[in-house]
Each structure stands twice: as C-alpha cells, then as structure tokens.
Amino acid sequence: MINTRKTHPLMKIVNNAFIDLPAPSNISSWWNFGSLLGICLILQILTGLFLAMHYTSDTMTAFSSVTHICRDVNYGWIIRYMHANGASMFFICLFMHVGRGLYYGSYTFLETWNIGVILLFTVMATAFVGYVLPWGQMSFWGATVITNLLSAIPYIGTNLVEWIWGGFSVDKATLTRFFAFHFILPFIIAALAMVHLLFLHETGSNNPTGIPSDADKIPFHPYYTIKDILGILLLVLFLMLLVLFAPDLLGDPDNYTPGNPLNTPPHIKPEWYFLFAYAILRSIPNKLGGVLALISSILILILMPLLHTSKQRSMMFRPFSQCLFWILVADLLTLTWIGGQPVEYPFIIIGQLASILYFFIILVLMPITSTIENNLLKW
C-alpha cells in the first residue's frame, strides 16, 4: 500500500518537518519554545484578523473603535485582551528561545541563528507599530518618542522621520501606515519562520549536551508532538489566566486616555518587553549614542558565533560560563526594572552600570571565561 503521507507533494513536506523528522532523543523542555512561538503567531494572526474587522485606522475614531470592540462586539473584549496579552506571551517565549540558544550554543547553526535574529527584529517592529494602534496617550507619545530617535541619524535624520510620519508630527497618515505595517508584518514573520525551520532541518536540532546526536535519533511523532501539546496547554492556561483575571496587569493605565498631542504623560515608557532596550537607550546622554547602543543590544546576538571561544558547544559542562549566563539574565531583569522607572537618582546610575555590564559580559567576560575553561580541561 502506498503511504500518501510520504508520497503526496504537500503532505511530504509536512511529514518531513513534523512527523518522520529524526529528532535527538534527549532534548529538554527548553526545545518546546519553537512550537510555542508558532502557536503564538497563529493566535496573534487570528485574533488580529477579527480585531481588524472592527478597527478603524483614523485618529478621530481609532480610540473609540477599540472601546466599541470591548463593549459592543460579541466577545470583543476577550479577543482584544487575548491579542494584547498574546504579544506578552510571544515575547516571553521569544526571550526563552533566544536564551536557550545562547546557553546550549545553538548559534553555531549560522543561517538558522541569523534568520532568528532577523525574526526577533521583525517581531519587535510589529509589536511597536501595533502598540500605536489603540491611539491612547502612551500609544501616541511612544510613537512620537521612538520614531523621533531616527532624527539622530546624521544629515538625513530629520527628513527620514518626517517621511515615516507622513507629515510634521505623528498624525492620521502615521496611524494609517502603522496599521498597514502591523497587518503585513506577521505574514512576513510566518515566511521567515519557515525559512528558519528550513535551515534548522538542514542540520538537525542541537541538544543539551552540544554533542552530535546522529547516532541516537527518534521520530518527532509521537514523542515530541505529545510533548509540544503539553507545552501548548500550559501556554494557553497561562495566557487565559492573564486574560480572564488580570488583563491590564502588563498594560499602561495612560493608554485608557485618548492620545492628546497637547498633554505629555509624566513617564513615557514602552511595553514591558522593550524596557531592557529602553533602559540601555536612556543610559547614554547622547542621542545618537543611545540609538546605536539600543540597536547594538540586539545586534550583538549576531556576533555570538564569533565570540564563542570554548572547545565545548553547550554550557552544560561549563560551570563558570553558567554563572556568567545567569548574571547576564539577572542584568537583563535589572534593565527591565530600570526601564520602567523615572529618570532620576539612583535609577540613572543603576541603568548605566547595568548597560555597561550587559556589553562587558557578552563581549569580554564570556570569551575569556571560555578560554580559561579550555585550559582547565588540560589539568
């Protein structure tokens, strides 16, 4: 009997990616985040589609249309909060996924890693333009402040900002184009995710030991399909707890006030998942320097394969590197906290120290520690 799963042109692709895929037998729950990100993306596209059916991208009616969705549309409130909190879940999974890659040395798959960094930038761009759409105070001023950073680019900066705004300030043209970007970008993310997966399946998955696992592979289905389903159930549980019990926990109260160009909020800050980068941006007194530091804080991930000096791929058997890794995590949490605080003593100095430490750990301490560990292997 001919097995359609293995012969049908379309089914064959699905089969080779999700069913008969040879997977390492020892990958832990840290390898669940790829599938969780896929689920997050599907969820965001679906909830976003239903929101777009009722949303109007006009400065006069945008805020009212979001209120209308929450009050008058059948189950509009749950769709809106699933979309808003779904973004938070997306970023939690994203940070865990990147952290896993750093810890276990997955960045040695160069193409997969670089596409992943591009994906990270694209998701961040999507989240930023999406945050502007409800046209609340924080939406409006967040858009004004962040787009204004481009004016730090020498010579073309001011023209570039006005070109993005579609005028001399954030206004109707800006909102309309941001809605267009927010609609198209998730589909670009989906396409990039497929390329990401394509490159991953060229090499096969990494595993916690960092040692090639060709000698010990198991089929993806049923072993990892059932494991992924457990992860998805936990993700949905956590998301729905957030949506149904504390929908505004991660949001900003200022966004329940319609955007007003004549009234600036006392503390302008982005959503929690951008706070670490925002803290790095604010810790440098110079505008251009801050923008460069902001971009570098993410772009530094591309350098990870070059900074890898260890003879071992994974950090599993490298206790000193493990300590540094967790100090880096603590540093990022500190930056996230600082990003949400007002610009005053002692937060300014803490932010500056945390920013310096962030780059110092990645660029200096990690390569040196790896070299020391290499020498310890000879003892």
Swiss-Prot record:
Coiled-coil residue spans: none
Residues annotated for a ubiquinone binding in this entry: H201
Transmembrane segments: 33-53, 77-98, 113-133, 178-198, 226-246, 288-308, 320-340, 347-367
GO cellular component, one term: mitochondrial inner membrane
Record's keyword terms, sorted: Electron transport, Heme, Iron, Membrane, Metal-binding, Mitochondrion, Mitochondrion inner membrane, Respiratory chain, Transmembrane, Transmembrane helix, Transport, Ubiquinone
PROSITE patterns: CYTB_CTER, CYTB_NTER
InterPro entries: Cyt_b/b6_C, Cyt_b/b6_C_sf, Cyt_b/b6_N, Cytb/b6-like_sf, Cytochrome_b, Cytochrome_b_C_euk/bac, Cytochrome_b_N_euk/bac, Di-haem_cyt_TM
Residues annotated as binding heme b b566: H97, H196
Subcellular localization(s) per the UniProt record: Mitochondrion inner membrane
Cofactor note: Binds 2 heme b groups non-covalently.
Positions of heme b b562 binding: H83, H182
Membrane topology designation: Multi-pass membrane protein
Superkingdom assignment: Eukaryota
Any one Gene Ontology molecular-function term assigned to this protein's record: metal ion binding
Cofactor(s) required, per the database record: heme b
Any single GO BP term: mitochondrial electron transport, ubiquinol to cytochrome c
UniProt subunit comment: The cytochrome bc1 complex contains 11 subunits: 3 respiratory subunits (MT-CYB, CYC1 and UQCRFS1), 2 core proteins (UQCRC1 and UQCRC2) and 6 low-molecular weight proteins (UQCRH/QCR6, UQCRB/QCR7, UQCRQ/QCR8, UQCR10/QCR9, UQCR11/QCR10 and a cleavage product of UQCRFS1). This cytochrome bc1 complex then forms a dimer.
Summary of the function given for this chain in its UniProt record: Component of the ubiquinol-cytochrome c reductase complex (complex III or cytochrome b-c1 complex) that is part of the mitochondrial respiratory chain. The b-c1 complex mediates electron transfer from ubiquinol to cytochrome c. Contributes to the generation of a proton gradient across the mitochondrial membrane that is then used for ATP synthesis.
Additional record remark: Heme 1 (or BL or b562) is low-potential and absorbs at about 562 nm, and heme 2 (or BH or b566) is high-potential and absorbs at about 566 nm.
Family: Belongs to the cytochrome b family.
Entry protein name: Cytochrome b
Protein's gene: MT-CYB
